[in-house]
């Protein structure tokens, strides 16, 4: 009633004038309202900012904010242009030419050119760099720069996925004249540039005003806070100390669903956690032991125990629903008698004692460790759990111990998701579980060289069948990626690749 009383007369005219002025100026006000600082919580410390050497999700986040790639993957899994505005391939798929977009600048002002691309690939190919994506780029035999904006790659064999792998995490294009500073003070061509990096505490980024996409990014700054404890993350986002919790601990989901100021944004992925059995160590040098462990694991129960139901059981990193998924292989109940038989054949009729290592700060993987201990009791494998701080886990456990829980993020293609892990020369295989199977090598090489979708699918169906009989480890599920986002954050969408695309995100 009070509002109606003052709707007319002099007061009404004043109100209408003020509203008109506000509407007239909203175009100039809106950008400043949408700018500001986005604060993100992540669980683990970053060891390096050199994209070729990155290995964990927190590092990948910075890769995509600070650096550009020749290509990128959209939310539908399609490869689209980034620094390269277009590309062509010869009929035999052995010669690929990428044409660089004009006006893409590095943060120090120089334009990205063909030699930067060549230098980037050379670093990845160099074993001394230690890049886990090296195996994907070993098929490049020769690189040429016909001019400053053209790069030509000649391959050792036909390969249809070259443009796809240039979208990957470690394949970010780096400036050839700033290589020495990449680990701690990198310069890229992405939407944000590094302001500061304090290991163990935070990464601060600021808008790159000369980013090649007009009007992007909207945010002035991004601050990535390292918060190992899930309780601290929860408190921070609920109070507004941070605006977004990346890769939300699943035990916190129900709590956040009750908060009207927070949105749970989720997306299915092909990201997986795995039970790693290192073939360089006994007893896992015997495939029968690895197979027995796999037979004893209840994957459907693992989804509930480790993920609280926010995932899907699977046999390999090819998720159910993918066109190449082998539907003839069913995910059933554990086969305890079959596992015991294999263990007896391998010389372990009474089972054995083993330590499994789990990383602190990765709660789903810690829950896997607990579940493994219980699931292996019926087959007389007695498991002791050792919890290891994340930094120590990366440096002293991963690839070095016999039995541990690890995890890996979605890759842009099936080939880049599988070949590095299962081929005997795969760069993840040789630093993870040291798996060797000549038949598997032939299958994966055939899939990589396939010229038709039908041929590629045939190879991957065979891959899944062989991985079931001779597993290097156990992949129990693929994960639903979840982020907790305050409602004043606009334009954010979770990525199936689990990176943060903040180019069009704003704060209201």
Language-model segment annotations:
Residues 41-91, 122, 187-188:
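N-terminal lobe/hinge region of extracytoplasmic solute-binding protein
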Residues 39, 113-120, 148-154, 190-191, ...:
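Alpha-helical secondary-structure segments
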Residues 44-60, 83-84, 110, 132-133, ...:
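A structural "hinge/loop" feature
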Residues 198, 273, 296-324, 360, ...:
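Detector for C-terminal structural segments
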Residues 180, 210-255, 382:
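Ligand-site clamp/hinge motif
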Residues 76-78, 166-217, 221, 229-231, ...:
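Gly/Pro-rich hinge or "lid" segments in bacterial periplasmic/extracellular proteins
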Residues 99, 133-176:
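Surface-exposed binding/hinge segments that line
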Residues 85-130, 146, 152, 236, ...:
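Aromatic- and charge-enriched surface segment that lines or borders ligand/interaction sites
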